[in-house]
Structure formats: structure tokens, C-alpha cells
């Protein structure tokens, strides 16, 4: 399998936008799940069942936050690298012009 490297700054920024959309989707779904767990806890669950449910949801919330952080990290890296490619391209063109 041949590896393809992304070197087009515009394509890199487009891809960064996709990662941002994915991060937003994960955040939205995590919020819905958290709200749903609060409704369960308020629907008569008590004691160990409620505590276990909240603990599980807390762990899932942490996992989703980690996923969002990773997606944002990739997004930020793509934008940073796109900017670096453009700066290097401009510097190379200036050198070639003499």
C-alpha cells in the first residue's frame, strides 16, 4: 500500500474542518447521553444503581472528552502544518527569484 502525504495547504485546512465537525458531533452526542443519564437518575433510581450509572457515565464522558481532545489536536496540527507549508513555499519562491 502506497502512503500518500498531504501537502496541499487548502486540502489540509479542509480536512481540519472535517475533524472539527467530528469533534462537534462527539461533543453533542456526549451531552445528550449525559442528559439522558440525569433523567434516569431522576426517574426513581437510587443507591448503588444510581451511583453506578453516574460513575459509568462519568467514565464515558471522560472518554469522549479524550476523543474530542485528540480530534482537536489533529485539527490544530493540520492547520499549523498548512501554514508552515505556505510559509516555506513563499520563502522558496523568494530564494529562487534571487
Swiss-Prot record:
CC terms in the record's Gene Ontology section: extracellular region
Swiss-Prot/TrEMBL keywords: Secreted, Virulence
Induction remarks: Expression is increased upon phosphate starvation and during infection.
Xref: InterPro entries: ESAT-6-like_sf, T7SS_ESAT-6-like
Traits of the deletion mutant: Disruption of the gene results in decreased dissemination independent of burden.
Extent of the signal sequence: none
Disulphides: none
Principal subcellular localization: secreted
Domain of life of the organism encoding this protein: Bacteria
Location of the protein in the cell: Secreted
Similarity field: Belongs to the WXG100 family. CFP-10 subfamily.
Function: Alters the host macrophage cytoskeleton and enhances macrophage motility. Promotes granuloma efflux, extrapulmonary dissemination of infection and bone disease.
Remarks, miscellaneous: M.marinum contains the ancestral full-length version of EsxM rather than the truncated inactive version which is present in other modern Mtb lineages, including M.tuberculosis H37Rv. Reconstitution of this ancestral version of EsxM in M.tuberculosis H37Rv alters the migratory mode of infected macrophages, enhancing their motility.
Name of this protein: ESAT-6-like protein EsxM
Gene name of the record: esxM
